[in-house]
């Protein structure tokens, strides 16, 4: 039976940095997406071809999804959320390529992504409201609730990391068990399950990040200004 590691396999060290298979795969995915973005954006024309039409449709769909949640700041948030979706979808599905494992089944990778979302929530919140106005929402409706606000920030970050890790790991285990039990009769259904689950998990992670960012942007005095 294939051994499934719950953490990254260490390949070596580059100075103080530990180089793991998950780190290399994550860098590879980011590099491929960056290169593809650079190539495809250079091909933009006034009369779009089929590829450009599809890409513009994807961008428009992502922008509309973000605008439905954050109508006041969707232009600033859309690039971040779309980057998350693209990275996670590619990272979740790269294990379909022989010789690669999905980096999102490594808890250190999902934790890094959750921490990125954590800081992004505060970054967008401070940009929209200002530092003092943003920090005030931690003291409302009563300063006594400050510890609970802080605990909530930490626990939802942990939950975001563990949820993605757990779902991707369970998908790998279920696929392996089905292959062991069914042999050659189940490869295609397992592949379809992997594709669907990988895309769904990428979408859910991005939506949760979007909701958290919306909460950071819309918290505090701004809500009072828009109330009748």
From Swiss-Prot:
**What NCBIfam families does this protein map onto?**
ATP_synt_6_or_A (TIGR01131), PRK13420.1 (NF009954)
The entry's localization annotation reads:
Cell inner membrane
- GO molecular function term, any single one: proton-transporting ATP synthase activity, rotational mechanism
Q: Where are the bilayer-spanning segments? A: 21-41, 80-100, 106-126, 173-193, 195-215
Among its keywords, does the record have Transmembrane?
Answer: yes
Whichever gene encodes this chain, its name is atpB2
Role description: Key component of the proton channel; it plays a direct role in the translocation of protons across the membrane.
In terms of InterPro entries, this protein maps to:
ATP_syn_F0_a_bact/chloroplast (IPR045082), ATP_synth_F0_asu (IPR000568), ATP_synth_F0_asu_AS (IPR023011), F0_ATP_A_sf (IPR035908)
Alphabetical UniProt keywords: ATP synthesis, Cell inner membrane, Cell membrane, CF(0), Hydrogen ion transport, Ion transport, Membrane, Transmembrane, Transmembrane helix, Transport
Q: Subunit structure of this entry? A: F-type ATPases have 2 components, CF(1) - the catalytic core - and CF(0) - the membrane proton channel. CF(1) has five subunits: alpha(3), beta(3), gamma(1), delta(1), epsilon(1). CF(0) has three main subunits: a(1), b(2) and c(9-12). The alpha and beta chains form an alternating ring which encloses part of the gamma chain. CF(1) is attached to CF(0) by a central stalk formed by the gamma and epsilon chains, while a peripheral stalk is formed by the delta and b chains.
UniProt-listed HAMAP family: ATP_synth_a_bact
Q: Name one GO biological process term.
A: proton motive force-driven plasma membrane ATP synthesis
User: Which Gene Ontology cellular-component terms appear in the entry?
Assistant: plasma membrane; proton-transporting ATP synthase complex
Q: What membrane topology term does the record carry? A: Multi-pass membrane protein
**What does the similarity note say?**
Belongs to the ATPase A chain family.
- Name of this protein: ATP synthase subunit a 2
PROSITE patterns recorded: ATPASE_A
């Amino acid at each position: 039976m294939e051994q499934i590691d719950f953490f990254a396999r260490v390949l070596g060290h580059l100075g103080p940095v530990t180089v793991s298979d998950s780190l290399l795969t994550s860098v590879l995915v980011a590099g491929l997406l960056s290169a593809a973005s650079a190539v495809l954006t250079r091909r933009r024309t006034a009369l779009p071809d089929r590829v450009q039409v599809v890409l513009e449709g994807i961008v428009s769909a992502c922008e509309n999804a973000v605008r439905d949640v954050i109508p006041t700041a969707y232009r600033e948030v859309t690039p971040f959320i779309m980057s998350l979706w693209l990275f996670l979808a590619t990272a979740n599905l790269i294990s379909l390529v022989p010789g690669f494992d999905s980096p999102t089944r490594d808890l250190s990778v999902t934790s890094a992504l959750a921490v990125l979302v954590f800081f992004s929530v505060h970054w967008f919140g401070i940009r929209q409201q200002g530092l003092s106005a943003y920090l005030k929402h931690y003291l409302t409706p009563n300063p006594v609730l400050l510890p609970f606000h802080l605990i909530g920030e930490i626990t939802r970050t942990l939950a975001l990391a563990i949820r993605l890790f757990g779902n991707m790991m369970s998908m790998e285990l279920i696929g392996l068990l089905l292959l062991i039990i069914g042999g050659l009769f189940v490869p295609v259904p397992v592949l379809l399950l992997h594709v669907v689950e990988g895309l769904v998990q990428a979408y859910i992670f991005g939506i949760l990040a979007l909701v958290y960012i919306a909460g950071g942007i819309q918290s505090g005095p701004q809500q009072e200004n828009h109330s009748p």
